[in-house]
Amino acid sequence: MSEKQSNRRGFLKTSAGALAATSVLTGTSKASVPAGPSANLRIGFIGPGGRGFGAHVKRMTKLQVEGEKIELVAVCDVYNKHAERAAKYIKKETGFEPKQYEDYIEMLEKEDLDAVCIGTPDHWHAKQTIECLGRGLHVYCEKPMTKTVNEAIEVLRAWQKSGKVMQVGVQ
């Protein structure tokens, strides 16, 4: 009887293969149909400091200025200066100043959003992604998506249940 040695690389390859096969077999690629060709995608930012400002806010603002059908409607950060900087930048470039929040739950409750960009510290990614998917929002989240395997499974389940588009950025 031969014994197989388990190692991290083998575990990851096997797990990734099983996850991919499950996704293909169960048809979990369920991108929602947009509201219509004239509807703008309403986007909120959670954590528009550092990477959230440079990669998310600036890039999305540029896309809006170039004519993409998006509206940058809200920014949220517990550090007010990050939210203020993002809101001022968006207003300077687009003429519209997004609403500012300190609490992302309040932003999700008050704003009529279609999607969020998450650029908060890593330990918040899973919680915020699950919350946003549960509210029917499309999600772009900076890497890492999660800190643990259990969190990754929870995010996967939330995504499968939501039928929304989710992407994890790797710069």
Predicted regions and their residues:
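N-terminal glycine-/serine-/threonine-rich beta1-alpha1-beta2 phosphate-ribose binding loop
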Residues: 2-137, 150-165
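ADP-ribose/adenylate-binding Rossmann-like module
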Residues: 136-146
